[in-house]
């Protein structure tokens, strides 16, 4: 394990690229290969830039969501329960999309010196939180998910992929139907716990019980949350309203420091025992993306990945005997500069 870490919220990046216009995910013939190229290219360019000053003392990690459920759903059944219905009503072939995401992650694990981490019962959030705790140096998180704001400090930085900037306070954001400005991560987290994450993870606000089945949830938005934060005794106020239990429920679901010890131990073990590969040539040959097979770009990829991860050696840097180029990729010879749109 190196001193520093660059960690990607892999699902977050994949979903953003899936919905780009160039991929045409809702069409009858989506550009799956183009999508995978864009995912990898975004990661590579970020690794190259973010790792430039780390002197090779850096691990690059992909944090994946578990394919076997989440511990949060075990304690709160509504957790993300509305996503399946949303996907079933979409024109996107999500089964195929997830297959393509998994294939890319598998190819990276097989060929590159990047750690691909998936832990049964855990989400990318749990993995990234653990990374922020076990790596002693600089940790750089790549995600547009605002949940990671609670981890930001002098050592942990968040690159917001949706606007291409490093996160900093004050932070203007939406919570429920309202908008506010957070001046600290503590304030941001408390508001999130109280108002819930109904549009994101289906976490109800603190006035809504877990077994709620009505047509309209009780309201509790930003104004109510900020007013409660000004209270001299927040716990007493919550108990008086009969919602302290729901507050603790939401804190368990949203506050990353609430990760169960056994899950933290599982992730830590995965981080320590994860094997990486040393075959960038093999990765490039596997996909044969034209813009990365050209001499200058190919050299940049080979030496860039080696430099950031502190690697060198013939298996990484020697040119292969034969270069191949897929004919079906001729139409993508000039990808241009794609951007991840908000």
Question: Where would I find each of the regions flagged by the language model?
Answer:
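Domain-level signal for Mg2+-assisted phosphodiester chemistry and nucleotide/NA-binding surfaces
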Residues: 1-106
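Acidic, proline-/serine-/threonine-rich low-complexity intrinsically disordered repeat tracts
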Residues: 322-324
């Amino acid at each position: 394990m190196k001193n520093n870490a660059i960690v990607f919220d892999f699902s977050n990046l994949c979903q953003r690229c899936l919905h780009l216009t160039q991929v045409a995910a809702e069409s009858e013939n989506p550009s799956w290969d183009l999508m995978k190229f864009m995912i990898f290219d975004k990661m590579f360019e970020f690794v190259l830039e973010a790792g430039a000053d780390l002197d090779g003392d850096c691990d690059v990690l992909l944090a994946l969501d578990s394919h076997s459920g989440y511990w949060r759903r075990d304690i709160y059944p509504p957790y993300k329960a509305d996503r399946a219905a949303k996907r079933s009503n979409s024109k996107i072939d999500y089964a195929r999309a997830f297959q393509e995401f998994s294939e890319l992650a598998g190819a990276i694990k097989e060929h590159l010196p990047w750690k691909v981490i998936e832990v049964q019962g855990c989400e990318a959030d749990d993995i990234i939180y653990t990374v922020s705790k076990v790596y002693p140096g600089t940790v750089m998180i790549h995600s547009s998910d605002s949940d990671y704001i609670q981890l930001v400090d002098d050592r942990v930085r968040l690159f917001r992929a949706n606007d291409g900037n490093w996160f900093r306070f004050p932070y203007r954001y939406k919570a429920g139907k309202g908008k506010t400005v957070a001046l600290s991560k503590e304030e941001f987290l408390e508001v999130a716990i109280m108002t819930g994450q109904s549009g994101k993870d289906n976490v109800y606000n603190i006035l809504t019980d877990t077994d709620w089945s009505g047509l309209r949830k009780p309201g509790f938005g930003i104004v109510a949350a900020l007013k409660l934060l000004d209270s001299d005794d927040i716990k007493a106020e919550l108990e008086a309203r009969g919602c302290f239990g729901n507050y603790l429920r939401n804190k368990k679901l949203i506050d990353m420091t609430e990760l169960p010890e056994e899950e933290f131990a599982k992730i830590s073990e995965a981080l320590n025992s994860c094997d990486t590969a040393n075959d960038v040539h093999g990765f490039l040959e596997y996909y044969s993306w034209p813009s990365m097979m050209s001499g200058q770009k190919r050299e940049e990829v080979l030496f860039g990945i080696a430099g950031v991860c502190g690697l060198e050696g013939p298996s990484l840097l020697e040119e292969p005997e034969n270069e191949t180029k897929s004919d079906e990729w001729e139409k993508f010879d000039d990808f241009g500069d794609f951007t991840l749109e908000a």
